[in-house]
Amino acid sequence: EMCIRDRLTGAGMSAESGISTFRDAGGLWDRYPVEQVATPEGYQRDPALVINFYNERRKQLLDVTPNRGHELLAELEKNFRVTVVTQNIDNLHERAGSSHIIHLHGELTKVCSSRDPYNPHYIKELKPEEYEVKLGDKAGDGTQLRPFIVWFGEAGPEIETAIQYVEKADIFVIIGT
């Protein structure tokens, strides 16, 4: 029995749903220098800018829906064991119905401790009414909540898990990256 095990999805997967990409012309990096909003140093220099940047990205999720590509991947789970390995930080795979997802770059709908970002005790899933994180909002360890995003210069906590799945995959498909 063949097992379609893994799919790697990137920005192109969610662009069709209306999610802004980072690298395309007119993308997020044209409007926000990467070193300001996607590095630990940028966060240390101006946490308010970084928090607001990701608040705006979260709000964008309220206006978009999964596209047919997300839905088709979710439908594959009816007949195959599927793991979606995604570089996307949105929640469109979950909303489409995929149940086994590895987020390489973090998850926009979660926040974590500024001191210990990948400690599972301090990671919190936000409800849509909580998407507006403010300076002063604290994690369980008393530090400022920060986006649960793997920034440039940080090691992603899910990379080893993803490698294990990819190595065991009968088929590996790359979509939108």
Language-model features, listed with the residues they occupy:
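Conserved catalytic core of sirtuin-type NAD+-dependent deacylases
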Residues: 1, 5-177
